[in-house]
Amino acid sequence: MPCFSSNQLAEWTGGNWSAQPRGDINGFATDSRTLSPGQAFVALKTDRRDGHNFLGDALAGGAPAAIVSAARADVALPQLRVDDPLRALQTIGREHRRASGAHVVGITGSAGKTSTKNLLALLLGGPPGVIATGGNLNNFIGVPLTLARIEPGSTRFAVVEAGISERGEMRGLAGMIMPDSGVVTLVGPAHLEQLGSIDAIAGEKADLLRHVPSSGVVAFPHQAWTHEPFRDLAAHAIVALPADASAPADSERTRFVPFFLEHGDTHTEILLTGHAGARSFRMRRVSGGMGQNAALAILIASELGVCDEAIRTRLGDWQPAALRGEVRTVAGRLVYLDCYNANPASMRDAIEAFNALATSRAPAGAARLFVLGCMEELGPDSPRYHRELGRWLRLGTADRAIAIGSQAEALAAGLAESGKGSVTVAQDVEEVRDTVISFAGPVFVKGSRRYRLETLFPVEAGVAAH
């Protein structure tokens, strides 16, 4: 467990202690309700709440100290007064990472970064020698909290996820992470409302990899190579090359590794080819996009010294996180749940995976139900993206689709243009809950988190996950 001295924290942050901490500080928390023993409370101030109002709760919760911008004499909790608690937390995370000696892998992407982060952490050996971002704590608060968990002398690898929604954010995150290696899973339309264009997204994602030293390695898919910021990284890049693509003629400085995916009923085979010969790996069945991300994780793990035998063993232990490509059997029918987030690329990838599963597991011609929550933060082109998705889906005669949310009409219009099934428009899940629950065939559920689509199929006893 890491240990932070009061002198060290004061030096890093430029702060002053009201009194010495009540015990050892081994980490930090920004929510007084979730404090663990030894965690100092960071009193953040936001538009919705002021952490200084919860110093008493932090004291009652056993916090050894707090980091504040305005000390409160009425709370008998040692307080480190700084100009800005958030900036202080970020400085602590950065300086602790700098001194740690751990190999830090940074991961970002328009889709799949959390699942890839979890998989890579597993391939590198998992706890206690490997730490990874918890959940999706990938922002200016979550990243330093993750870095502060590195235990010098014990943590060999830290796999840190970086998520952005506005221009310039990646530079700040990468400056804290200081990645020794880096992975970008995908460049695609996500957070366009703030980022403005795919080119801007590519530049932001590549910014994480620019912070990797020349002695390190970066990995990304062939799709990202089409964007100039990624071609600028050619000298130390590994590019995953799908079976239907070929390496560009001007890529002699870059290592392109062809990969092939073969999907069975329950498993996906990943074949990597190259100068070292063919290498095959097996994992539970995943989508094509996740298969590509697995190839990237395998390539990075190999570069970091993990042998193929260990990778194969650990791949066998992997399973998707809840609501991220999760396959369940509910009342005898196939249910595909991918409700954490949605953008055009991840939508198509998940639908393709569901259709393949439904074809192999359901009777021929069985009706399918697509519950489609809208994709948020796509900017002024949002109606077009939704209409294009609907047009691409091509419902069968017996199929049904439910479009939920702000762009439901545009999505429904696209579905009507290309498909033959029936389409329902709704604003929230409660309008269609009975319809979904009573549907007898395979069900696909995906959309942005704000629509709470996961509430249609809460986890219950007797529900099987695959």
Regions found by a protein language model. Name each.
Residues 47-49, 321-323, 340-420, 466:
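Active-site beta-alpha connecting loops in nucleotide-dependent enzymes
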Residues 441-462:
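Peripheral docking tails and interdomain loops at the edges
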Residues 8-10, 88-222, 226-234, 439, ...:
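Phosphate-binding loop of NTP-binding sites
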Residues 1-91, 95, 391-392, 396-410:
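N-terminal leader/targeting and accessory segments in enzymes
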Residues 80-84, 422-432:
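Short acidic-hydrophobic, aromatic-tinged amphipathic segments that line or gate anion-handling sites
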Residues 72-76, 181-334, 359, 366, ...:
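Acidic, Mg2+-coordinating active-site environments of NTP-dependent enzymes
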Residues 107, 322-326, 450, 454-455:
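ATP-dependent carboxylate/acyl-activation modules
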